[in-house]
Amino acid sequence: MSWMTDYVRPKLRGLLQRDVPDNLWTNCESCGQMMLTKELERSEKVCPHCGHHMRATAKERLGWTFDGGEYTTIELPKMPVDPLGFKDSKRYTDRLKDARHKSHLDEALVVAHGMIKGQKAVVAVMAPEFLLGTMGAALGEAFVAACRLAVLQKAPLVVYTASGGARMQEGVVSLMQMPRTTIGVQMLQEAGLPYVVVFTNPTTGGVSASFAMLGDVHIAEPNALIAFAGPRVIQDTVREKLPEGFQRSEYLREHGMVDIVAKRSELPELLGRILGIMMRQKTVSDAAA
C-alpha cells in the first residue's frame, strides 16, 4: 500500500461525499453570475453584480417593509374551494393543496399591519410563490379584508403586486374579482385614506387591469414587467416591433403610468415619507371639515 492509496484517495472520496445543500448557490436571472444564497438574501435578493431585483416571497417583503421586521398578520376570510369543480391535467383542489404545502400560505395574498418608519400602516403582499400570484375569489376577498382593516384602523394601505393575472381554474368567478377589488379601493377613497401600490415583477392580467392601477401613488421596482397582455402577445397581434423596454417600469414612468421607480432597499424610507405626508394632509382636511 502506498501513501496515495492509503491517505489521498480516501480523503478525496470523503470530500466528494460530503453533503452540499441544494440551495447553497443561486444564479442571477439577468447576468447569470453565481452567488451564495445567504449573501443574496442579505442584499434583499438584489444581484450585487448587475442590480437585478429577483423574485421575493410575501413574508420576505413584509419583513423588509415593517420597522424592525415586526408585524401582525390577519386571518383571511374563508371562501368556497373550487366553485367550478375544475380539472385539467390535475384537479384544482390538488393544485391548491400543493401550493399551500410548498408556500406555507393559505392564499396568494398576505395581509399584515404594523409600523413603517413610525407610521401606522396596513400592507397587503401578493405571493408569486402561490400559483404565480393569480387572482381568484379568495384573493379578492382577502384584498377587500385588507381595505376594511385599513378603514377600521384609519391607516393607509400599501399593496405589493406580483401576479400572472386571473386564475383560470375559477373562470368567470376569477374575473368578477376585478370589480370586487375595485369596490375595496372605493372604500379607501370614501374614507379619505392613502392607497399606495408597489409594482413588482411581474404584474399582469386582471390584477394590472383592476386594483393595481387605482393607487394614489404608483411605485415600481426597477425593470418590473407591468402589463395586461405580455409584449410577445402584443407584438404578434400588431405585427410591429415594440419599443425597447416596452411595459417595463422605466418605460411606464416616462409615459406617466408610474410615479416613481425605486430600488428595493429604498422602499421602506420612501413609503414612510409618502405615507407621512399623505396622512398629515388628511388630518388637515379633516380639521378643516
UniProtKB/Swiss-Prot annotation:
Q: Name one Pfam family in it.
A: Carboxyl_trans
Cofactor: binding comment: Binds 1 zinc ion per subunit.
Protein transport recorded as keyword: no
**Which coarse location class describes where this protein primarily resides?**
cytoplasm
- What's the catalysed reaction? N(6)-carboxybiotinyl-L-lysyl-[protein] + acetyl-CoA = N(6)-biotinyl-L-lysyl-[protein] + malonyl-CoA
Q: In which pathway does it act?
A: Lipid metabolism; malonyl-CoA biosynthesis; malonyl-CoA from acetyl-CoA: step 1/1
User: What does the entry list under GO cellular component?
Assistant: acetate CoA-transferase complex
The cofactor named in the record is: Zn(2+)
Q: Where in the cell is it found?
A: Cytoplasm
- Does the keyword field hold Metal-binding? yes
User: What InterPro entries is this protein classified in?
Assistant: AcCoA_carboxyl_beta (IPR034733), Acetyl_CoA_COase_Trfase_b_su (IPR000438), ClpP/crotonase-like_dom_sf (IPR029045), COA_CT_N (IPR011762), Znf-ACC (IPR041010)
Gene Ontology terms: biological process: fatty acid biosynthetic process; malonyl-CoA biosynthetic process
Q: Which domain of life is it from?
A: Bacteria
- Per the record, the zinc finger regions (C4-type) lie at 28-50
Q: What's its EC?
A: 2.1.3.15
- Which residues does the record give as Zn(2+) binding sites? C28, C31, C47, C50
Q: Which residues form the CoA carboxyltransferase N-terminal domain?
A: 24-289
Q: Which PROSITE patterns did the record assign?
A: COA_CT_NTER
Quaternary structure, per UniProt, is: Acetyl-CoA carboxylase is a heterohexamer composed of biotin carboxyl carrier protein (AccB), biotin carboxylase (AccC) and two subunits each of ACCase subunit alpha (AccA) and ACCase subunit beta (AccD).
> Could you identify this protein by its name?
Acetyl-coenzyme A carboxylase carboxyl transferase subunit beta
Q: Which organism is it from?
A: Gluconobacter oxydans (strain 621H)
The root-end lineage is: Bacteria, Pseudomonadati, Pseudomonadota, Alphaproteobacteria, Acetobacterales
Source gene?
A: accD
